[in-house]
Amino acid sequence: GMVKDKQNKKALENVNVSVHGSNIGTVTNAEGEFALKIKKTETPRELDISHIGYVNTHISLEKETTAMLTVWLTPHSNLLNEVVVFAENPRMIVEKAINKIPLNYSDKRDMLTGFYRETVQKGRRYIGISEAVLDVSKTAYTNRNINYDKVRVEKGRRLLSQKASDTLAVKVVGGPNLGVTLDVVKNKGALLDFEELNNYEFWMAESMLIDNRMQYVINFRPKVILMYALLYGKLYIDRERLSFTRIEMSLDMQNKSKATTAILYKKPLGLRFKPQELSYLVTYKDVDGKTYLNYIRNTIRFKCDWKRKLFSTSYTVASEMVVTDRKEGVLENIPNKEAFSLNQIFYDKVDEYWNPDFWGN
C-alpha cells in the first residue's frame, strides 16, 4: 500500500504500519510505500497506521484483496488548546527518562526479526543496494549492556552491484549491527549516559503528538569541545510515561578532521575525503505498556576527489533496519560463530546468505 498526507497529497516516509494486535509491522519507504509479508494462516483484519504529527488511523481489511491500498493521514492541527509553559528543566526530564528505562523497556531477552537495507548513491545514481532478513537477540534493558546482544543474517540478496567502472568502491562496515549499536536507549555509550549529558546543553521545543500521545521535545547540542566530534539533535519523550519514543541526532561537522575520524574506516592513498553529514533516526513503539525498538536509519553524505583532479563526486550511504516481528522471553541466544561481526562488510558477504526465495516463508 501507500500512505499520503490528506491535505497536500504528498507521500509520507517512515510511517509505522502494523498488524493490529500483533508484533508484525514495517515502515513506509521514501515513496510512501509499504509491504507486509504475512502467512495465509495469519490474514490480518486491521492495520494500525501512525506517524509523528498525524492522527492515528485504523484500517479494516477485506478477507482478500490484491488492490493497492492507499491510506490518507490527517495532520494534527495543534491540539494544545491550553498554553503550555515550559517550567520544567529539560536536562532533568532527560535524566528522569533515563532512570525509567529499566521500567519502560523490555525486562526480558527478546528475539527481533528485522528487514535491513543498505544503499550507496553516487550523485543521484544508485550504485549499490543490498538487503537482508536479520535476527537480533537482545538482553533485557534493565542493565543497558549491549555486550551480549547479537545479530544474525538469516538471508540476503544484492539488488544492485557496484561496477568495475566506478572509480571508488564504497562499503559499510558492520552495517547489520546497527540494531545493536544504534539502539540509543540500550547502548548508553551512544548518548544517554549521565556523564555524557554534561557535554550538552538542552532546551525545550514545542510539544508533539506521536501515536496520539503528547511528547516532550528536547533539543540538545554540544556545549564543550572534546577530542572527538559530538552530536546535536532532538529527543522525544512521552510526557506521561517518560519513555524515549524518537531520537534524531547528527554529528557536529564544524571540525572536519574529527568528523572524518568518526565516519571513515579506510580510504585509498591519494583520495581526499570531505564529510558532509552523518545523521541518525531511531524510533520506538509502545506496546501494552512497554516500549520497543521499531526503526533505525543511518545516513552518511560525503564528497571525494583525487589529488590533481578538479571536480569532486558526492556520495550518500544509507543503512536502515525496521523491526518486522518480535518474540518475547526467548532464552535462546545467537551463537558467536553465527553472529555478524562489527568489522565485517555485508556487501562483500551477501552472497553467502543468498536465498532465491528471499520473500518466502
What are these regions (language model features)?
Residues 15-19, 32, 47, 85:
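Hydrophobic beta-strand segments
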Residues 19, 46-59:
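A short, solvent-exposed loop/turn motif at the edges and junctions
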Residues 23-33:
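Short, acidic Ser/Thr/Gly-rich low-complexity loop/linker segments typical of extracellular
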Residues 26, 55-68:
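Structured interaction patches on ligand/partner-binding surfaces of diverse proteins
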Residues 34-36, 67-69:
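Short strand-edge motifs at loop-to-beta-strand transitions and within beta-strands
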Residues 70-200, 211-214, 260-264, 268-361:
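Surface-exposed, low-complexity/disordered segments
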